[in-house]
């Protein structure tokens, strides 16, 4: 968390988002010190909504006032909503926001994706590469509290983080963003 993480109008803004009526979350980032398949990621903003329709989520993201270079979201957002008859991705498109998704097995694999994202929290030298403005309170809380289910001896060990409905949405949005901006190469799903 750093106060000096600020919006730079000369740099593109990218978005990772996780759809959901009960909890929806979007993170807005800019890249610094970009290399071939890595960069410092500066999270400049967030949208965190509860009990909100997808159209309201899209409008809130638009209201931040950034011009978005790329938006990546949950592939499940391409499924048709039974009540509206259109997908979350189509709702965003109707608002002028094109959401990109990848459906390949490696990108969609949660275990591989979480492992990939860890590089930004701490690299092999112990240095962070994800820097977050303090106003992104819900993202910060989620990143600090994302966890795995408690293991009991009578259960199979779970390799996927706990879907708690509170902290997983921001973390999923970050995963969708980073696995698409910086694709996982030469890895197998799982």
Protein language model features and the residues they cover:
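Short, structured patches in soluble enzyme cores that scaffold and shape functional sites
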Residues: 19, 28-30, 45
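Metal-dependent nuclease catalytic cores in nucleic-acid-processing enzymes
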Residues: 171-183
């Amino acid at each position: 968390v750093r106060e000096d993480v600020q919006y730079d109008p000369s740099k593109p803004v990218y978005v990772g988002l996780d759809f959901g009526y009960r909890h929806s979350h979007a993170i807005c980032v800019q890249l610094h010190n970009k290399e071939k398949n890595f960069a410092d990621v500066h999270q400049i903003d967030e949208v965190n909504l509860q009990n909100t329709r997808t159209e309201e989520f899209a409008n809130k993201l638009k209201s931040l006032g950034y011009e978005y270079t790329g938006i990546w979201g949950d592939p499940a957002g391409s499924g048709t909503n039974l009540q509206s008859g259109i997908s979350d991705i189509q709702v965003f498109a109707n608002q002028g926001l094109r959401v990109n998704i990848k459906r390949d097995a490696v990108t969609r694999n949660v275990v591989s994706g979480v492992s990939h994202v860890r590089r930004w929290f701490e690299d092999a030298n112990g240095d962070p590469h994800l820097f977050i403005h303090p106003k992104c309170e819900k993202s910060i809380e989620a990143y600090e509290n994302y966890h795995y289910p408690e293991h009991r001896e009578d259960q199979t060990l779970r390799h996927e983080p706990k879907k708690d409905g509170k902290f997983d949405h921001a973390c999923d949005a970050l995963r969708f963003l980073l696995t698409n901006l910086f694709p996982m190469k030469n890895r197998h799903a799982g």
